[in-house]
């Protein structure tokens, strides 16, 4: 194991003919850890689970008033033990529900190869290739997320309106006990990934060791950990069980609103519709997702494993949870405005990504906004010493800003929050978090590209100077 670490650590740089130092295989997470990164990692490991618990507890015990628990503790009206005593414990019912859920998603992922791509025009499913890894490999993936999502939701509606095997409110009725189950899976997966990377990695050349336990545990060591040929940890845990569950969780919230108040408010419908568009878009473009930063940059550790099991399903669905406890009926004008903001944001997000995908598929032999797109050609060297070429487009939305897809994503995120009105801060956490996440991702992605492409990246940033907001940032 020590020899593998030394071998990996020596792969950083290589001399080329002109004597300059050329970065080799330098994308992916860091080889070394600075103090700020280490402090951030330790902070997240210590407090991220508490943040999730605090948000969910605030709704369960304080009607989603974020400051109320702190004020009660400060004033002496409540003690930590009082809050904890009111928190639902882990139950066997929740364990059985969660085990059934995860097992069902594993079954759909592993044992039902995609057939939708055979008769749904425009959909790219089945066996697809990912991007080249730092070690120079191109992995193949079984893309069947849209099929899994469709089957899951057809069964959910069949149960809700015909079979009645379980209540449509089953998720929210067991929401906090399910939180403990999700944490158990998240930590188990992250720990297994750490052990696997050290003792039986899928590809040792795509492992990165820093020598710091906390950083390696959180950010991951293996680039693409797998069990067997097809069970890819990244693809499974990012899409299933988290994102497939996203829309089911929202449907459970809507069912609870109907049960409690006798109606589903237009704000709940808006949240369900706008977030469902995002989820379906994700699975429709799952093969495109194989070329994004999560697959092409991140190693698999606690950040992805626990985050996909806990952070995503619990904090990305806060708007629906808030509306269960605080139903909001928007005016027609406000509802239309929120809908338009969400749809325009989605259009920018989707068309920006579509332009990039079209440009890649055709190697630039296409038209963007009626013209042949302009680009800057770059080269990089993978860890196996091979030289590869890429083109960075500077036309269409990609000529307006380097990450305008993130701008559209943020517009959609804001729409989800605005549907909840302005009485509480809690539903706006998602927009605040996504802003921080995507700005950080901009910087992280550009650091990766700068390491990967060198001086060619500087030419690109000169041609497209803004990241998210033209004229501002």
Swiss-Prot record:
Keywords assigned: Cholesterol biosynthesis, Cholesterol metabolism, Endoplasmic reticulum, Lipid biosynthesis, Lipid metabolism, Membrane, NADP, Oxidoreductase, Steroid biosynthesis, Steroid metabolism, Sterol biosynthesis, Sterol metabolism, Transmembrane, Transmembrane helix
Binding site for NADP(+): 356, 360, 393, 398, 405-406, 445, 449-453, 460
PROSITE patterns: STEROL_REDUCT_1, STEROL_REDUCT_2
Reactions this protein catalyses: cholesterol + NADP(+) = 7-dehydrocholesterol + NADPH + H(+); 7-dehydrodesmosterol + NADPH + H(+) = desmosterol + NADP(+)
Source organism: Xenopus laevis
Keyword Oxidoreductase: yes
Homology family: Belongs to the ERG4/ERG24 family.
Subcellular localization(s) per the UniProt record: Endoplasmic reticulum membrane
Major location category of this protein: endoplasmic reticulum
Origin: domain of life: Eukaryota
Keyword Oxidoreductase: yes
Enzyme nomenclature, EC number: 1.3.1.21
Spans traversing the lipid bilayer: 36-56, 97-117, 175-195, 264-284, 304-324, 329-349, 419-439
Membrane topology: Multi-pass membrane protein
Protein name as catalogued: 7-dehydrocholesterol reductase
Pathway named in the protein's UniProt entry: Steroid biosynthesis; cholesterol biosynthesis
């Amino acid at each position: 194991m020590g020899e593998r670490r030394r071998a990996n650590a020596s792969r950083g740089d290589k001399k080329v003919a002109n004597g300059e130092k050329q970065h080799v295989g330098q994308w992916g997470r860091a080889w070394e850890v600075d103090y700020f990164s280490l402090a951030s990692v330790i902070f997240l490991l210590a407090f991220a689970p508490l943040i999730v618990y605090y948000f969910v507890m605030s709704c369960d015990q304080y009607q989603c008033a974020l400051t109320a628990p702190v004020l009660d503790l400060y004033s002496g009206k409540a003690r930590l033990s009082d809050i904890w005593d009111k928190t639902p414990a882990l139950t066997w019912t929740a364990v059985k529900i969660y085990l059934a859920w995860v097992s069902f998603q594993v079954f759909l992922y592993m044992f039902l190869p995609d057939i939708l791509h055979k008769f749904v025009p425009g959909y790219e499913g089945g066996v697809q290739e990912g991007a080249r890894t730092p070690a120079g490999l191109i992995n193949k993936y079984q893309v069947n997320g849209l099929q899994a999502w469709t089957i899951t939701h057809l069964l959910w509606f069949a149960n809700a309106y015909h079979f009645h095997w379980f209540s449509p409110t089953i998720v929210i009725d067991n929401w906090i006990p399910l939180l403990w189950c999700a944490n158990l899976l998240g930590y188990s997966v992250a720990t297994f990934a750490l052990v696997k990377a050290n003792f039986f990695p899928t590809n040792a050349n795509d492992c990165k060791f820093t020598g710091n336990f906390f950083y390696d545990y959180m950010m991951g060591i293996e680039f693409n950990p797998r069990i067997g040929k097809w069970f890819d940890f990244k693809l499974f845990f990012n899409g299933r069980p988290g994102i497939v569950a996203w829309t089911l969780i929202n449907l459970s919230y809507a069912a609870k609103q109907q049960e409690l108040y006798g109606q589903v408010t237009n704000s709940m419908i808006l949240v369900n519709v706008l977030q469902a568009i995002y989820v379906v878009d994700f699975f429709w473009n799952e093969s495109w997702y194989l070329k994004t930063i999560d697959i092409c940059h991140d190693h698999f550790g606690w950040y992805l494993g626990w985050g996909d099991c806990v952070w995503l399903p619990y904090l990305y669905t806060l708007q629906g949870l808030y509306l269960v406890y605080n139903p909001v009926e928007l005016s027609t004008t406000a509802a239309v405005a929120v809908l338009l903001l969400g749809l325009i944001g989605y259009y920018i997000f989707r068309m920006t990504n579509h332009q990039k995908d079209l440009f890649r598929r055709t190697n630039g032999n296409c038209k963007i906004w009626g013209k042949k797109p302009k680009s800057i050609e770059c080269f990089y060297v993978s860890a196996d010493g091979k030289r590869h070429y890429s083109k960075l487009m500077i036309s269409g939305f990609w000529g307006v800003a380097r990450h305008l897809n993130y701008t559209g994503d943020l517009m959609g995120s804001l729409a989800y929050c605005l549907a909840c009105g302005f009485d509480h801060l809690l539903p706006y956490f998602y927009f605040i978090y996504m802003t921080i996440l995507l700005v950080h991702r901009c910087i992280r992605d550009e650091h990766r590209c700068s390491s990967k492409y060198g001086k060619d990246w500087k030419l690109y940033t000169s041609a497209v100077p803004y990241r998210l907001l033209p004229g501002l940032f």
